[in-house]
Amino acid sequence: MLSNTKRTEIKKSQKKAVFETTKLYQIIDESLIAHIAINQDDQPFVIPMLVWRVDNNIYVHGAKNSRLMRALKQGQSCCLTFTLFDGWVLARSAFHHSAHYRSAMVFGQFETIESNAQKNQLLNHFIEQIAPGRSELVRQGDEKELTATELLTMPLTEASVKISNNGVGDEAKDKDIPVWAGVLPYRTIVGPLIDDVEHDRSIPQPDYSSVYGERWYIPK
């Protein structure tokens, strides 16, 4: 269960708060991109980054000389947000139009992964989450590449989750208005694969559908 701290307490629309750790994991794993907020020289920055999870830790990587990596490596406290948009809620009044979404907010400090061997292992884990079996086929990062890459980790010890999925919430006075009401779903579809222009046609396309479930593209 997620702990309720001063920073993670949900004050607006508390009924949308969710405390199951599994929901937090699902949002992180599906969204892939986090917006990371930092403060540098009294100037706020919000930077979108690829983020992946292994057990109860998240990981982010980038060039060592980047603004974000330098700030996070110094142990600066930061906030990350993950958001999945699931659809529009079309009500009978303009005021009650809203959205279905799943969101998570994570607080903490990142720590540096120093070992190149550990970097390689964790980066391969990320590849396997995207394309199972691929890390065994591609060239592994060499010492120069791994040394130039900053890899940081943060435990998921302070986080909140908010989910909106309750459909239309019209007032009684509006329910007789003769207009369609309901949900316009949004869904991210993964695939089909697009070959590189220099792809050797004798190499068959792989099947990565196992990690995407119902989001995998199925031709009609």
Where are these regions (language model features)?
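C-terminal edge-of-domain segments
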Residues: 1-7, 119-220
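An N-terminal domain-cap segment
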Residues: 4-59, 70
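Catalytic micro-motifs at enzyme active sites that drive phosphoryl/nucleotidyl and oxygen chemistry
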Residues: 38-41, 68, 91-95, 139-141
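Structural motif
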Residues: 57, 77, 109, 150, ...
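Short, structured beta-strand-loop surface elements
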Residues: 65-125
